[in-house]
Amino acid sequence: MEKLFIKPDSLLKDSSQLAWNVYESGFEPNYIIGVWRGGAPIGIAVQEFLSFLGIKSDHVAVRTSYYSGIDSRKDSVQVYGLNYVIRQLESEDRLLIVDDVHDTGNSIAQIINDITSACKKNTPDIKVATPYYKPNKSQ
């Protein structure tokens, strides 16, 4: 399969559609995590769109390290930058994790695992949103 390059205007349009889908689902996140790098601009667009619709949220970017190069992975996923969110989250909160592409799901799974391990009984309702996916890689 040939690599697809997405133009900035298409990314913004797709990010707005993703935000609308979240809104229409009835899920109102009060925290949004954008997964650095690709998910950060999408997370910003989703947060701005939802804010315009009256849904206020705190938002941060977190980084994962899993890839050592294109299509080359390390053995485990490391997550960086969750401390602020973990200190803030309560069980009644709603967290939206935004990334650009759903690939294997391993990075998102590790973020969720780290949050649930740290928050224990204070783990919030967590949803994931991505505008794109790799059908041949998803697990």
Where are these regions (language model features)?
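PRPP-associated nucleotide enzymes
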Residues: 1-139
